[in-house]
Regions:
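Second-shell loop/turn segments in exported
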Residues: 28-37, 53-63, 93-98, 143-154, ...
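Short secondary-structure junction motifs
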Residues: 86-89, 120, 176-178
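N-terminal hydrophobic or amphipathic helices/low-complexity stretches enriched
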Residues: 21-67, 72-82, 120-122
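Sec/Tat-exported extracytoplasmic proteins
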Residues: 47, 51-59, 72, 79-83, ...
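Acidic/His- and Gly-rich active-site-bordering loop/insert found
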Residues: 50, 76, 97-139
Length: 181
């Protein structure tokens, strides 16, 4: 058994040495060009703004979440996407088991499809705005305030959604179905 494993390992090593181990690129833009594109720059700006300290972690119902909703609304409008909610989103509540109501916000935007037969069918694209917010904890006997900025707590998802909205709005004549964000 040990001999079979040695032979199989040797064969795998030979094939690994034969196959080129470098990435293969087709003709076209380089990684540096892609990283410097309008879309990537805009996404970085969105993530930076949405996860900024002033947003205080965007906890549901917080001022930071309200400011994020206002930012998202402004970007949709800048991109020419119809916004169906208020300037800082629509507030909704979720009743919890203990009787408290957790409030949060939604921003709703819309691009109408160009095909009369399909425009009443919808593609729904979403990303959550809220994140963990802030908390206070005790570490080694001292109180520490912590902010969960949330760049990967869906600021990146919001950025992707905003740039997708821009691209879809730019190409809206090609859309058959309507898109709801």
């Amino acid at each position: 058994m040990k001999g079979k494993i040695t032979i199989i390992s040797a064969i795998c090593a030979i094939f690994a040495a034969i196959i080129p181990a470098k990435a293969q690129f087709m003709n076209g833009p380089s990684y540096a060009d892609l990283n410097d594109s309008e879309t990537v720059r805009a996404m970085k700006e969105h993530v930076s703004t949405i996860s900024a300290a002033v947003m205080e972690g965007r906890k549901a119902g917080s001022e930071g979440e309200r400011m994020t909703a206002e930012y998202v609304t402004g970007i949709f409008k800048k991109y020419g996407v119809d916004v169906l909610s208020g300037k800082d989103g629509d507030v909704f509540g979720i009743r919890q088991e203990n009787g408290d109501t957790l409030t949060s916000r939604n921003v709703i935007a819309f691009i109408q499809g160009g095909d009369k037969a399909l425009r009443d069918k919808y593609i729904v694209i979403g990303a959550r705005m809220d994140n963990l917010g802030t908390d206070t904890m005790t570490i080694d006997g001292r109180t520490v305030d912590r902010t969960y900025y949330g760049a990967n707590g869906n600021a990146s998802g919001l950025a992707m959604m905003l740039e997708l909205a821009r691209m879809l709005q730019t190409n809206s004549p090609l859309l058959g179905r309507s898109v709801l964000f």
